[in-house]
């Protein structure tokens, strides 16, 4: 039986990505950078990220558009319902695809075009590029 892909394997189809709300979990961003993606990570608090990942302090509810403009995908992992709309909006503003995972059993509160099974659970496609 074939194992589902990792989130990084799915997102690696994009060359420039922004992770919103990286917090203390840079694993996916690091894996994407290892696959050759240009990765920018954002959070409202200062975070430690691998040298291969660019970090920018930003609040997605009041985003600095320049942080996202070059991205062809914006994603948020363990994204709480109250931030989902802001993540989708910033992706839409720059013409980027948008992917979300949720926290445990929390719902997706934005429209999604696809639910992909990944090794860690579900990856929701909230916006195609």
Curated annotation (Swiss-Prot):
Pfam families: UPF0146
Top-level taxon in the UniProt lineage: Archaea
Record-linked InterPro entries: SAM-dependent_MTases_sf (IPR029063), UPF0146 (IPR005353)
Gene3D superfamilies tied to this protein: Vaccinia Virus protein VP39 (3.40.50.150)
Family: Belongs to the UPF0146 family.
Protein name (Swiss-Prot/TrEMBL): UPF0146 protein VNG_2609C
């Amino acid at each position: 039986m074939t194992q589902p892909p990792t989130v990084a394997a799915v997102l690696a189809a994009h060359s420039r990505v922004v992770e919103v709300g990286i917090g203390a979990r840079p694993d996916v961003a690091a894996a994407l950078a290892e696959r050759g993606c240009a990765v920018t990570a954002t959070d409202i608090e200062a975070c430690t990220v691998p040298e291969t990942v660019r970090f920018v302090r930003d609040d997605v509810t009041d985003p600095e558009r320049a942080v996202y403009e070059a991205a062809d995908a914006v994603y948020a992992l363990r994204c709480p319902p109250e931030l989902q709309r802001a993540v989708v909006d910033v992706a839409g503003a720059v013409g980027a695809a948008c992917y979300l995972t949720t926290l445990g059993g929390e719902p997706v509160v934005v429209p999604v075009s696809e639910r992909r099974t990944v090794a860690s659970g579900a990856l929701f496609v909230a916006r195609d590029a």
